[in-house]
Amino acid sequence: MDLETKVKKMGLGHGQGFGAPCLKCKEKCEGFELHFWRKICRNCKCGQEEHDVLLSNEEDRKVGKLFEDTKYTTLIAKLKSDGIPMYKRNVMILTNPVAAKKNISINTVTYEWAPPVQNQALARQYMQMLPKEKQPVAGSEGAQYRKKQLAKQLPAHDQDPSKCHELSPKEVKEMEQFVKKYKNEALGVGDVKLPREMDAQDPNRMCIPGGDRSTTAAVGAKENKLAENKRTQYSCYCCNLSMKEGDPAIYAERAGYDKLWHPACFVCSTCHELLVDMIYFWKNGKLYCGRHYCDSEKPRCAGCDELIFSNEYTQAENQNWHLKHFCCFDCDSILAGEIYVMVNDKPVCKPCYVKNHAVVCQGCHNAIDPEVQRVTYNNFSWHASTECFLCSCCSKCLIGQKFMPVEGMVFCSVECKKMMS
């Protein structure tokens, strides 16, 4: 397929999840409606992951595409219908007998994802070492956490040009080369193993503090005894605390098998969130999630959330923007050369600021222009003018004077305050 055809086929999937309720805004949101180039809802400005959208198939396609053309193809299967790679997510179902007064019932727990290991007891141990609120039990807070992290850590628009907004053929080519490079050099999936099993595979390895291992072979009975003792001294590469005997550890092939992590310590070095499904990116001795690895390699547009592959872009408010995406967060008007105000780290044009965000003057009850001086006390504001910042009793101008505040009123003296009480 040539680049022109690829560009024409691009679309952001605007029909997906349409009308789904927002789990954060509740009834304040009319239902999910994807913005035409931002990755947020047009109604409430929350992301798709904050809405009750069934995304399991879409997420499995996304991860499947990530693993395509890598050594992790054993984790994907291609659909016969369209050849799309699907992530073979390992689902774990545990059944626990629960004793009641008369009968024994079966309590079933389904994990929406579990480490792909043959030993289910090891997978169960791994899950128990995660914080309760991050265990991906179906229908739980942990499952919702995993869903959010899949969206946050592995954005589809970081690997698939068809999920991006109006890329040029040149940008498509550059993105494809970038994705190929990080698949070859950084992408990995953690392995859950017992440290002693790793030693059994290579008896010459001995563990020393910090998770690092030496390759000095033991010679003689005393040396063998010393080596055996040292093998129990495992420590986590992240927290440097010791690993308990019999507990599972996570290894990352890109990092080398001389390093290991507690399950709860296998986190992104930037956002410090659990690496979703143990999918990591390794760079300069650090673990990253997909998002923050890409951020370390390319600028990201604060408007559309996509990586920038163009040589021309703008920087404002310590953020990067596609030239066409430096827009008002409320009305999408271009802000180049215009006056704007930052509201919650988002640029807003002056008319939208006055209409939607400006504070109201307690004196004249009109919105206060962002370029006009004002007086603020607690949650109340006034125009800093002789017409507005006045004693609520005698109308004396209080600019530069002492005053007594009472809720939304101000007084020049105790006498004026008493007269209004």
From Swiss-Prot:
GO terms for molecular function: zinc ion binding. Residues 155-164 have a biased composition (Basic and acidic residues). Disulfide bonds: none annotated. SUPFAM superfamilies: Glucocorticoid receptor-like (DNA-binding domain). Residues 133-164 are annotated as: Disordered. PROSITE patterns: LIM_DOMAIN_1, LIM_DOMAIN_2, PET. Keywords: Cell junction, Cytoplasm, LIM domain, Metal-binding, Repeat, Zinc. InterPro entries: LIM1_Testin, LIM2_Testin, LIM3_Testin, PET_domain, PET_testin, Pk/Esn/Tes, Znf_LIM. One of its GO terms (biological process) is negative regulation of cell population proliferation. Belongs to the prickle / espinas / testin family. The keyword Ribonucleoprotein does not apply. It comes from Equus caballus. This is Testin. The N-terminal and the C-terminal halves of the protein can associate with each other, thereby hindering interactions with ZYX. It is found in: Cytoplasm; Cell junction, Focal adhesion. Scaffold protein that may play a role in cell adhesion, cell spreading and in the reorganization of the actin cytoskeleton. Plays a role in the regulation of cell proliferation. May act as a tumor suppressor. The keyword Metal-binding applies. Residues 234-297, 299-359, 362-421 form the LIM zinc-binding domain. PANTHER family: LIM DOMAIN-CONTAINING PROTEIN (PTHR24211), TESTIN (PTHR24211:SF1). One of its GO terms (cellular component) is focal adhesion. Gene3D superfamilies: Cysteine Rich Protein (2.10.110.10).
